Amino acid sequence: MDEKAAPGSETAIFAGGCFWGVQGVFQHVKGVSKAVSGYTGGAKDDAVYETVGTGRTGHAESVEITYDPSKVTYGQLLQVYFSVAHNPTQLNFQGPDSGTQYRSTIFAENDTQKQIAQSYIDQLDKAKLYPAPIVTTIETGKTFYPAENYHQDFLTLNPTYPYIVYNDLPKVANLKQLFPALYSEKPVLVLSASN
């Protein structure tokens, strides 16, 4: 169920707290060609930070990951998501951020992703790897809206920003330590550093 596929590209969308850290982690995963911060899961036909931040639109801060399934599998992306990108036991908050816009949600692109994600959650629950129940939800059929440019590549462009230093750089360090075969020293960026 988690074999590497033929070359090409697929997408995965994960929400797990502030998108700066989630994006920063997946920008360092080999086989990922793009990781874009944005908003998914709301009822409105558009999303911007100012309205999503109120917690009333139903959107979650999320990251759309484009990856080559011949280099990294959806299952491996799930491992990174559950192990280092966020804490799947925190309901509607991650670290210092609270509200439904910071929820733990997998936005499955198709039935296969939904089945793999549900299987993975079931395995984690059965293994009791976490001290609390996993609260990650799976949603389908949701539109992804890219976030504003000032949110893209935030971790890479602002490595000394206190929020990044305290909350997000440790996630990238954990990726390198726990998944050395998947770790890429050079992140794939959405914007060039000159923008």
Swiss-Prot record:
Alphabetical UniProt keywords: Oxidoreductase
Reactions accelerated catalytically: L-methionyl-[protein] + [thioredoxin]-disulfide + H2O = L-methionyl-(S)-S-oxide-[protein] + [thioredoxin]-dithiol; [thioredoxin]-disulfide + L-methionine + H2O = L-methionine (S)-S-oxide + [thioredoxin]-dithiol
Xref: Gene3D superfamilies: Peptide methionine sulphoxide reductase MsrA
Catalytic activity, EC: 1.8.4.11
GO biological process: protein modification process
Domain of life: Bacteria
PANTHER family, sorted: PEPTIDE METHIONINE SULFOXIDE REDUCTASE (PTHR43774), PEPTIDE METHIONINE SULFOXIDE REDUCTASE MSRA 2 (PTHR43774:SF1)
Family classification: Belongs to the MsrA Met sulfoxide reductase family.
Name of this chain's protein: Peptide methionine sulfoxide reductase MsrA 2
Organism: Mesorhizobium japonicum (strain LMG 29417 / CECT 9101 / MAFF 303099) (Mesorhizobium loti (strain MAFF 303099))
High-level lineage: Bacteria, Pseudomonadati, Pseudomonadota, Alphaproteobacteria, Hyphomicrobiales
Gene transcribed to yield this protein: msrA2
